[in-house]
A protein has these predicted regions:
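S-adenosyl-L-methionine
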Residues: 1-55, 65-72, 93-121
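Conserved beta-strand/loop positions that form the S-adenosyl-L-methionine
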Residues: 59, 82
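Class I SAM-dependent methyltransferase "Motif I" SAM/SAH-binding loop
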Residues: 60-64
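Conserved SAM/SAH-binding beta-strand->alpha-helix loop
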Residues: 85
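A short glycine-rich, Lys/Arg-flanked "PGG" loop and its adjoining helix->strand segment in the class I
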Residues: 146-160
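Conserved beta-strand signature within the Rossmann-like core of class I S-adenosyl-L-methionine
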Residues: 161-168
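Class I S-adenosyl-L-methionine
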Residues: 179, 184-227
């Protein structure tokens, strides 16, 4: 079985801020009763879950609309979600249990740490990152997750032909990400029509609906790993 690729990062600020969000009673009940069933943290458990399967990784899945949709539409796949906020995890656990989904696992930790330390090389087919924090203030741009180092890390974890699917409502962030991929010959740009039905027909997330209501422009970047 392939081993996790070691990429060395300089110490830098996290791309998220830990906060105590409100957790509903339903979310709390799901966290208490379903944690051991769906949450994985050990490298061996993650490797066993994704080994030899079509695997999608949803980074920062929020309320889990895309995560649940993918698990339902591709029951032959494994869907791994990375999320640091317990409210979103609680929502997903409740939905997954109600729908009797067996092909979902959740990792409650920083996505960069997960990729660097626990995901085997060349093991992921699709990575999704929808509406990550854009850190709009210039002094906070260093906190943005997608940097040149992160793209190299993504490359090492995706299979050849694997896809990175990114959405943001912040034009400056989109332009920055677009330039990074354009400068890297290991990636080829795709359009929505190039994707499978399970990726074309995902529901709008709650954040996406809010952005549309506020008339913020939605920007999409889809790239395929070619080298």
């Amino acid at each position: 079985m392939p081993q996790a690729h070691k990429v060395t990062f300089s110490k830098k600020p996290k791309s998220f801020v830990t906060r105590r969000g409100r957790i509903t009673s339903n979310q709390r009940n799901a966290l208490d009763s379903l944690w051991n069933q769906y949450i994985v943290s050990e490298v061996s458990d993650i490797k066993e879950f994704i080994s030899g399967k079509y695997t999608l990784l949803d980074i920062g899945f929020g309320a889990g609309e895309t995560l649940i949709s993918l698990a339902e539409s591709r029951k032959d796949s494994t869907v791994l979600g990375a999320e640091v906020y317990l409210s979103g995890i609680g929502s997903v656990l409740s939905k997954a249990d109600n729908l009797k989904l067996k092909n979902i696992r959740i990792v409650n930790e920083d996505a960069e740490d997960l990729l660097q330390q626990k995901i085997p090389d060349h093991s992921i087919d699709v990575v999704l990152m929808f509406y990550p924090d854009p850190w709009p203030k210039r002094k906070h741009h260093k906190r943005r997750l997608i940097k040149k180092e992160f793209i190299k890390l993504l490359n090492s974890k995706l299979k050849t032909g694997g896809i990175f699917y990114f959405k943001t409502d912040w034009k400056d962030y989109f332009n920055e990400v677009s330039c990074l991929f354009k400068e890297d010959s290991d990636w080829k740009e795709l359009s929505l029509k190039d994707l499978g039905e399970h990726l074309r027909n995902m529901p709008s997330t709650s954040f996406e609906k809010k952005a549309m209501k506020a008339k913020r422009l939605l920007n999409t970047k889809i790239v395929e790993k070619v080298n």
